Amino acid sequence: MNITVSLLSNVFDQLCEFSRCHCIAICGGLVPFNLILSFLTLVYVVRQASPGLIQKNAIAVYGGVTLMVLHVSTWFLVGVVMIPTFLLPAFGAVCVAINLWGTHSPDSLRRFLLWLYRTVLKRRERATI
């Protein structure tokens, strides 16, 4: 029993060390991944794509956010408390919120996005001379 616990502990330590050593590469991959797929969810909702397509996209985002939160938690485990360790989970929460909204109430999200687009466009037209 002690050998199994020791082996699992060693593997966990190695995974955490790998995560911290390759932080720039991991964040450099996961942040754009989540950003692009969350934006794609918004595009799918506005274009009224099939719910299955939106759900598949959301599942990919949930996986990416989970990996990002696990990566950030390795920094919390060693006591590193910096701005990125708080911004990345907040960014992940926004991505999850967008995708939850897009999968559970796409009509509401579509109305909001169209309202936002019209509001921004009207302000821009008023600002021109």
Per-region residue spans from a language model:
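Membrane-interface helix-boundary motifs at transmembrane edges
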Residues: 47-54
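Membrane-helix boundary elements
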Residues: 1-46
